């Protein structure tokens, strides 16, 4: 059974998204990816609306079977953490309104699945994603896009069944 996974790396300034397809034999193929950018001077509501519309457009275009998000983490800057939480909330609502099952990974779990090391660097994640999906190293300058690719490439049928509660 094949399925299409949408990976989304939330960010109020840049939200990365990526779509991959799995065939029934555990092979993964790159479909598309991109970044939804917002203006840093814009209002919070306008920025969240732009992210909502951008991801909604992607969903309409590719009709994914499942969505994969990175779990929120709290960093040293509470303002940044709060903005990330707003963004995740808007994304979860967008995905739920589109009827998608959502699988979530902690950053360390994602890194472990992609590189074998839960403390991998952004460069290591980027390299392994390029190798796994056969991508051009110059695809994007944004780590947000590579994180979204890693998310999409990491989800398994088992994760989907677990998210569905079956």
From Swiss-Prot:
Amino acids binding Mg(2+) 1: 9, 144
Active-site residues, as the UniProt record annotates them: 9, 70, 144
Signal peptide: none
Statement: the UniProt record of this protein carries the keyword DNA-binding: yes
Chief localization: cytoplasm
Keyword Nuclease annotated: yes
Bound cofactor: record note: Binds 2 Mg(2+) ion per subunit.
Enzyme Commission number, as recorded: 3.1.21.10
Any one of the GO BP annotations: DNA repair
InterPro entries for this protein: RNaseH-like_sf, RNaseH_sf, X-over_junc_endoDNase_RuvC
Localization terms from the record: Cytoplasm
Pfam families assigned to the protein according to its UniProt record, in alphabetical order: RuvC
Top-level EC class as recorded in UniProt: hydrolase
UniProt binding sites for Mg(2+) 2: 70
Cofactor: Mg(2+)
Source superkingdom: Bacteria
Subunit structure comment from the entry: Homodimer which binds Holliday junction (HJ) DNA. The HJ becomes 2-fold symmetrical on binding to RuvC with unstacked arms; it has a different conformation from HJ DNA in complex with RuvA. In the full resolvosome a probable DNA-RuvA(4)-RuvB(12)-RuvC(2) complex forms which resolves the HJ.
Physiological role: The RuvA-RuvB-RuvC complex processes Holliday junction (HJ) DNA during genetic recombination and DNA repair. Endonuclease that resolves HJ intermediates. Cleaves cruciform DNA by making single-stranded nicks across the HJ at symmetrical positions within the homologous arms, yielding a 5'-phosphate and a 3'-hydroxyl group; requires a central core of homology in the junction. The consensus cleavage sequence is 5'-(A/T)TT(C/G)-3'. Cleavage occurs on the 3'-side of the TT dinucleotide at the point of strand exchange.
PANTHER family named among the record's database cross-references: CROSSOVER JUNCTION ENDODEOXYRIBONUCLEASE RUVC
Entry protein name: Crossover junction endodeoxyribonuclease RuvC
Organism of this sequence: Neorickettsia sennetsu (strain ATCC VR-367 / Miyayama) (Ehrlichia sennetsu)
Gene: ruvC
């Amino acid at each position: 059974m094949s399925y299409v996974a949408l990976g989304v790396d939330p960010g109020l300034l840049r939200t990365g998204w990526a779509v991959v397809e799995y065939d029934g034999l555990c092979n993964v193929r790159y479909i598309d990816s991109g970044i939804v950018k917002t203006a840093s001077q814009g209002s919070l509501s306008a920025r969240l609306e732009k992210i909502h519309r951008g991801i909604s457009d992607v969903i309409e275009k590719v009709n994914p079977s499942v969505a994969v998000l990175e779990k929120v983490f709290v960093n040293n800057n509470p303002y940044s953490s709060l903005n990330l939480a707003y963004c995740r909330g808007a994304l979860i609502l967008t995905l739920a309104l589109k009827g998608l099952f959502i699988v979530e990974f902690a950053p360390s779990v994602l890194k472990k699945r992609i590189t074998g090391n839960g403390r991998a660097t952004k460069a290591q994640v980027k390299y392994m994603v390029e190798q796994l999906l056969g991508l051009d190293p110059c695809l994007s300058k944004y780590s947000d896009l590579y994180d979204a690719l890693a998310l999409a490439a990491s989800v398994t049928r088992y994760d989907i069944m677990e998210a569905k509660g079956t």
